[in-house]
A protein has these predicted regions:
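N-terminal beta1-alpha1 cap of cysteine-dependent amidohydrolase-like domains
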Residues: 1-79
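Histidine-centered active-site/metal-ligand motif
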Residues: 8, 108, 139
Length: 148
């Protein structure tokens, strides 16, 4: 399996997601559009992971690649290929499907326990993590779920 990873800032790396992908013998392509590297024009991997960054999901004027990234994420899902959006990545995925991005309204910083839903327990990836596990959050933006 080939997985495309998008890193949206020089300080955000694939970390434990990369470790898990390496352990699964996945081939990894890393895209760094923040550095000027162009994104692929269409889905060219089996799955896509989009990480966070300090920008908001609507900072098109300072990060002009964001609309193309949202479109690329939608193109992956249109082909029924998995997409994982983390932090900014989840905000961009919501944007791609018509969700509204809300800036500076969800001030959340620190460790918080996350629990899997029934769908999470049935997921082939998430089913491998504990029912409840700690994550570190550091954000102030959020989004509404897209229609449907």
């Amino acid at each position: 399996m080939r997985v495309a990873i998008v890193e949206n800032t020089r300080i955000t790396h694939h970390g434990q997601v990369g470790v898990a992908l390496h352990e699964a013998a996945a081939l990894i392509d890393i895209w760094r559009p923040w550095s000027g590297q162009p994104l692929p024009a269409s889905p060219d991997a089996d799955a896509l992971v989009v990480f966070g960054g300090e920008q908001s999901a609507v900072d098109d004027h300072t990060h002009p690649y964001l609309p193309a990234l949202a479109e690329l994420m939608a193109a992956y899902t249109a082909l029924d290929r998995p997409v994982l959006g983390i932090c900014l990545g989840s905000q961009l995925l919501a944007r791609a499907y018509g969700g509204d991005n809300h800036l500076g309204v969800a001030l959340e910083f620190g460790w918080v326990d996350v629990s899997l839903t029934d769908a999470g327990r049935a997921d082939p990836v998430l089913s491998q993590v504990p029912q409840t596990f700690p994550i570190f959050q550091w954000h102030s933006d959020t989004f509404t779920l897209p229609p449907g």
